[in-house]
Amino acid sequence: DDVQARLAGIQRLLVIAGYDAYPIDGVQGAKTQAAIAKFLNERKLAADAVATPAVFDALIEAARNPEGVGFSWCNDTKYPVMASLGFAEMGSIVTRGWYRVESGQCVRPDLRGDPRRVYSYAEAVDGSGRTVKRGDTALSWGGTLALCTRDGRFELADHKDCAARGLNSTSFAVIDLGNQPATIVRFKDQ
């Protein structure tokens, strides 16, 4: 139907612009509502603008320029990438994952508050969800800060003794957001 097709078009443009509006199915679920609200707020558009044709002009402009505002991951590889994010909250670092970043796409994860620093880890996966390897080394993007993750969906605030608790100790990169209006981490084949 026309309403579902229109919403699927909005979802698709949001995803291209770096917003997390998956799945692209024309159904207005919680993730789609949050992505639309965030887009409208960041672009300083009225809440009812989504019902107007002008929203498509704004979405197309955002899709052409995903660097607009906020933090985004962009995938320049031929593989899907699974990414996880860390941020400071009430004196500790909270890690959350996994975000799927399709080849050639960008995702703007939802950040709480206005952090000056985030922590990022990602790995390329094959069609079965297994980590892509180059020889014996995973095709991944991280750093040196060890934080806990798990294989399935997670949100964790305690990063002591990851292995003893059945979690993975994962090396995150520290990303300084500073006062920049936009920060993009690009995943490239190494």
What are these regions (language model features)?
Residues 1-190:
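Cell-envelope/ECM-targeting effectors and their regulatory/trafficking segments
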